[in-house]
Design a protein with these regions (language model features):
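Non-catalytic C-terminal accessory region of glycerolipid acyltransferases
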Residues: 9-137
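Catalytic core of membrane glycerolipid acyltransferases/transacylases, capturing the structured
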Residues: 1-8
């Protein structure tokens, strides 16, 4: 457990460094801390403060993304490439403005607020997908 925590802290520091100084890098991150295993692509787990901490400290450009159509069974997902499996739909939002958070105190509360705000933006993209997908059923 102690080794895992030490590795997690190292990973967060490294991620902050890459976000701050690694121009041109694209990093995908689940604000929930992991992928939801729900079959409903529009239900999310609660946002965790970890990505908020990374964003607060590195102040990178943040683009929300909503992805649906990926399943939790890798073998079926790969097989779907040949058998016409479910289409993967990806929605990219506009870069989001986070300056209002950078003037707040560096705290877990602020990190959580950033993560929640990001999840709201991802949820908005999910609602666009739902409206578009339901209209074409």
């Amino acid at each position: 457990e102690a080794n895992k925590r030490a590795f997690d802290k190292f990973s967060v520091r490294e991620l902050i460094h890459i976000c701050r100084y690694g121009r041109g890098h694209v990093i995908g991150f689940h604000p929930e801390g992991k992928r939801s295993l729900s079959s409903d692509p529009y239900s999310f787990l609660p946002a965790q403060p970890g990505i908020g901490k990374v964003i607060y400290e590195a102040q990178p450009q943040v683009v929300p993304v909503f992805i649906t159509g990926l399943r939790n069974e890798l073998a079926k997902q790969i097989l779907g490439n040949w058998t016409g499996g479910e289409k993967v739909r990806i929605w990219f939002g506009e870069p989001i403005e986070l300056n209002e958070f950078y003037t707040k105190r560096d705290s877990v509360r602020t990190h959580k607020e950033i993560s929640d705000f990001l999840m709201t933006k991802i949820g908005e993209l999910g609602e666009k997908d739902r409206a578009e997908f339901e209209a074409h059923k």
